[in-house]
Amino acid sequence: MGLIKLKVNTNSQQYSIIIGNNILKKVNKFLKENSIDFNQCLLVIDKNIPKNLVKDTLKSLPKGSVSIHYFNASEKNKNLKSVNEITSILLKKSFNRNDCLISIGGGITGDVSGFAASTFKRGLKFVNIPTTLLSQVDSSIGGKTGVNTKYGKNLIGSFYQPSLVISDTNFLNSLPKREVVCGYGEILKHSLINGKKFFYFLNKNGKKIIQLKSPFIQTAIHQSCLIKKKVVEADEKELGIRKILNFGHTFAHAFEATLRYSAKLNHGEAVILGVKTAARFSLLNKILNKKEFELIDGHLNDLNLPRDINKFFSIKNLNTIISFMRKDKKNNTKKISLVLLKRIGSPVYKLQFNEKTINLFLKKELTK
């Protein structure tokens, strides 16, 4: 497949998403085409990315204008301290609002860099070059930035749209399979909230996508971006329909926080568990029918993806999981807000449940 270009139109910003293979040598060309100019540029690069994969970007940018900050990307480093390190560099080097910050890394790097860009002098040009499957299909699009705290995930942040997103699928070949599965969690989520066609494509081709086979991986990325773009354009600040993008995430964020963001469960795996848990909760509350639940569960089983929360948690974790769900940013009453499924491709988001209902449900799931 050739170069794919999408245009995202939100109230605050219009920007392009460029998807292709081995396109980093054209970064400066893409910047010029999108009227992104600057005197200085700070690259925030995930230190875990092989250096040979970013050398084309460095060669492409104007000499003398670039500073580099290597960031040790992890959920534990997704915090205000890391944001402060970036903004301190910008201040020391006398950056101004006409300059640019470019993130090269996965979702964590993009979230931290984007938040730093949004707060520096109330807004610095921000270009996102996502390097993981998860960030290419989800977190790089839509303007959500932020950091974790001891009270929960992404509780401090901002909506700040990038000026440009450049997704080079060549990065994906360097990922361990577990990181590819991590991204597949968000692809699966998108397929369940927007019609049935994409889910059936995944159900048929999921193994090829996880194996990064062409053209299946490119199609999955393209379709995920189209779904995310459509939702973000309709509701930039998550006041309504954008909440459907949180399908599975209320459970997922609580699972991650309960494990203190340990390597036992990465974000995408938590999302897959959260999707399964939300689908089962939908079934048991007579919102989703059994046939469609079994289609979803069967798909997870066929791909050997995480399905059962009792393999990661025990009953002793129940109160902690509930406490993090209580702190979820989508809640605006004493009840817990959940995005559930009516059918594959048809989510419902204006649903609230008392803690007792969720407690009883999780208790049964944890003691199976």
Swiss-Prot record:
Cofactor: Co(2+); Zn(2+); NAD(+)
Biological-process GO terms, alphabetical: amino acid biosynthetic process; aromatic amino acid family biosynthetic process; chorismate biosynthetic process
Catalytic activity: 7-phospho-2-dehydro-3-deoxy-D-arabino-heptonate = 3-dehydroquinate + phosphate
Enzyme Commission number(s) from the entry: 4.2.3.4
MF terms in GO: 3-dehydroquinate synthase activity; metal ion binding; nucleotide binding
Taxonomy, superkingdom: Bacteria
Major subcellular site: cytoplasm
Cofactor binding description: Binds 1 divalent metal cation per subunit. Can use either Co(2+) or Zn(2+).
One GO cellular component term noted in the UniProt record for this chain: cytoplasm
Alphabetical keyword list: Amino-acid biosynthesis, Aromatic amino acid biosynthesis, Cobalt, Cytoplasm, Lyase, Metal-binding, NAD, Nucleotide-binding, Zinc
Family according to the record: Belongs to the sugar phosphate cyclases superfamily. Dehydroquinate synthase family.
Described purpose of this protein according to its UniProt entry: Catalyzes the conversion of 3-deoxy-D-arabino-heptulosonate 7-phosphate (DAHP) to dehydroquinate (DHQ).
Designated name of the protein: 3-dehydroquinate synthase
Gene: aroB
